[in-house]
Amino acid sequence: RGFWLLVMGFYVCGFQIQFINNHLENYLDGTIVGGAMAATAIALIGLFNMFGTQTAGVIGDKLRKKYLLANLYMARSVIFLIFFIVPVSKVSVIIFACSVGFLWLATVPLTSGIVAQIFGPRYLATLYGVVFLSHQLGSFTSVWLGGIIRTQTGSYDYAWYMIIVAGFVAALLHWPIDEQPIVRPVAAS
């Protein structure tokens, strides 16, 4: 059960980050800062991602990964919500990009760490591949739905609501995950 909760949570990771990656420019183009500011934002996201991912890996060695993931998804949604309700300016875009960048792929060492911790290194590649597939499906879904929402309504408002709510749902999904390693019987000689 915990594995499938992790799969669903990582779906949300892809769902959130690819919406930003693919629709931020168009979203900002409709504001006073213009779409060109999105290039700066994506660059800052990439820069802060390096530090956030490294930090998550280090902290994940010391604290329970499932709780770190739950808090990470919740923090992302809070950042998205604040960015969505605060008037857009160059300063708000820079603060948003740095904040969300720090959390951008910080999910990866924690998610792969849970898979390794539960199933062991022998099954890590295959099982993390399944988890990563869900990330890609989430990516596709948010990019596609974001485009449909923008086309149908002329606004990204409902898409922002979607990624915000999805993050809170992902936070809840991680709480019941059992991180204990699976005990396998030792084969007799």
Which residues does each PLM region occupy?
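Extracytoplasmic gate region of multi-pass secondary transporters
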Residues: R1-V58, V108, S142
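Cytoplasm-facing, short amphipathic helices at loop-to-helix transitions on the intracellular side
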Residues: F3, K65, P121-A125
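C-terminal transmembrane helical hairpin of 12-TM major facilitator-type secondary transporters
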Residues: F19, A43-N49, T53-I114
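Interfacial helix-cap and linker-helix signal at transmembrane-aqueous boundaries
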Residues: L28-D29, I59-G60, L145-G154
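Loop-to-transmembrane helix entry/capping segments in MFS-fold secondary transporters
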Residues: G35-A36, P121-V130
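Paired intracellular helix-loop junctions of major facilitator superfamily
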Residues: V115-L124, G154
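Multi-pass alpha-helical transporter architecture, strongest
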Residues: I164-S189
